[in-house]
């Protein structure tokens, strides 16, 4: 069974989870945030809705998109599994990380016979991958140290992630509304922000947009010629089809800056967007 996206928000509503989950449903898998619309799911509401129907249901979340943008409390939310990818926040490709709850850790699985039942590791991992991930954590803790006098690494990490989220929300607002030097996406003729919502507290720093009468691939190429990197997400891709069509589109241009971008970077992107919209309108 597949839960359908809300075309107005680009997310999955708890009510939709109630529709597809029953007392015999074993597993619910849900993305923490959409990598196309940037919508952060109401995970508390989704978990609560599922467990009201089946208290024993296993719930896992794909947090590849959301993990680099805000802290997650897996214990509070009651997840049984979480996965994320270090390449999304300056780490190495070729490796992913996961979390499993105590009850999942003890499920039957392939393991070295003499190891404890909750150990899933097989063989020797690549030290370089862990070194790269450790450097990411060091960086976030360094950021957190600018906003607190705490020395505990977990507290530093949480503060760092919270400020990353706030910084990105400010950049998202700038993209949408602009500055006195560059008009925002909401105010450029011929430009459309898809699945746009006023409440930015439930959005990661991602915008799905389009320009009137312009092929997505052609538009991406024109951005690249001007030094701006964006990507097309179209329904011909198996990775994009469900959510793109779920919000009533055939494709969108995905714009996804990060906290380290500046207001000046956003202004340059907005100026290029306005320039392209005017050129294509001729």
Predicted regions and their residues:
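Pyridoxal 5′-phosphate
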Residues: 1-282
């Amino acid at each position: 069974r597949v839960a359908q996206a809300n075309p107005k928000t680009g997310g999955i509503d708890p009510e939709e989870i109630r529709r597809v989950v029953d007392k015999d449903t074993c597993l619910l898998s849900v993305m923490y945030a959409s990598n196309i619309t940037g919508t952060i799911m109401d995970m508390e509401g989704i978990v609560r809705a599922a467990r009201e129907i089946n208290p024993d249901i296993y719930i896992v979340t794909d947090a590849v998109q959301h993990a680099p943008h805000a802290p997650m409390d897996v214990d509070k939310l009651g997840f049984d599994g979480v996965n994320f990818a270090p390449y999304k926040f300056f780490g190495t490709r070729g490796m992913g990380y996961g979390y499993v709850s105590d009850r999942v850790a003890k499920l039957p699985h392939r393991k070295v016979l003499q190891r404890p039942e909750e150990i899933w590791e097989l063989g020797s991992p690549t030290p370089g991958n862990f070194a790269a991930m450790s450097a990411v954590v060091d960086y976030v803790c360094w950021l957190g140290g600018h906003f607190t006098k705490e020395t505990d690494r977990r507290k530093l990490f949480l503060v760092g992630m919270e400020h990353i989220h706030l910084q990105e929300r400010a950049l998202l607002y700038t993209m949408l509304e602009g500055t006195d030097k560059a008009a925002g996406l909401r105010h450029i003729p011929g430009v459309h922000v898809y699945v746009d919502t006023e409440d930015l507290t439930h959005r990661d720093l991602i915008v799905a947009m389009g320009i009137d009468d312009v092929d997505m691939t052609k538009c991406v190429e024109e951005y690249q010629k001007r030094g701006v990197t964006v990507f097309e997400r179209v329904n011909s891709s198996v990775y994009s089809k469900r959510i793109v069509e779920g919000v009533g589109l055939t494709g969108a241009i995905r714009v996804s800056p990060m906290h380290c971008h500046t207001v000046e970077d956003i202004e340059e992107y907005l100026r290029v967007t306005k320039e392209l919209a005017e050129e294509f309108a001729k």
